[in-house]
Swiss-Prot record:
Cofactor remark: Binds 1 zinc ion.
Family the entry assigns: Belongs to the endoribonuclease YbeY family.
HAMAP family listed in its UniProt record: Endoribonucl_YbeY
Compartment annotation: Cytoplasm
Listed cofactors: Zn(2+)
Xref: PANTHER family: ENDORIBONUCLEASE YBEY, CHLOROPLASTIC
Binding site for Zn(2+): 113, 117, 123
Known EC number: 3.1.-.-
Gene: ybeY
Protein name: Endoribonuclease YbeY
Function description: Single strand-specific metallo-endoribonuclease involved in late-stage 70S ribosome quality control and in maturation of the 3' terminus of the 16S rRNA.
UniProt entry keywords in alphabetical sequence: Cytoplasm, Endonuclease, Hydrolase, Metal-binding, Nuclease, Ribosome biogenesis, rRNA processing, Zinc
Domain of life: Bacteria
């Protein structure tokens, strides 16, 4: 159960997680969901790219922490491609500071959160949100990361 990660860094931000960090976090998501090898792209971007993508795909004219673009295979074609995660380094750093969280822990949370979106989980209604948050908390515990929702 391992992720094949295409890591693209299109950001000059400092203190980014290592490729090994992304690999461990994504492997944990796949293992938790009992999935075999899957491939995905993680792209770390600047604020402008995040804002442009968020406006184009979600109609929101502001940067966001993570965007998930699930891969949809054509009918009859089975591929182990999950899709793409686009993470805005500046937004993640700002949120970590604002929420008094360790930057590394917030990065882990955003990657786990985004990967669960790629697997079809969502938080549109309360029941979905509770399920998704519980999965995130359970996966993050493996890395000794506290419940990111405990202060909300």
């Amino acid at each position: 159960m391992s992720a094949i990660v295409d890591l693209q860094v299109a950001s000059d931000a400092a203190n980014l997680p290592s490729a090994d960090d992304f690999q461990r976090w994504l492997n944990a998501v796949l293992a938790h969901q009992q999935l075999s090898e899957h491939e995905l792209t993680v792209r770390i971007v600047e604020t402008q790219e995040s804002q442009e993508l968020n406006l184009t795909y979600r109609g929101k004219d502001k940067p966001t922490n993570v965007l998930s673009f699930p891969f949809e295979a054509p009918p009859g074609l089975s591929l182990n491609l999950l899709g793409d995660l686009v993470v805005c380094a500046d937004v993640v750093a700002h949120e970590a500071d604002e929420q008094h969280k360790k930057l590394h822990h917030h990065w882990a949370h955003m990657i786990v959160h985004g990967a669960l979106h790629l697997l079809g989980f969502d938080h549109i209604n309360d029941d979905e949100a509770k399920e998704m948050e519980a999965l995130e908390v359970d996966i993050l515990k493996q890395f000794s990361i506290d419940d990111p929702y405990q202060d909300q």
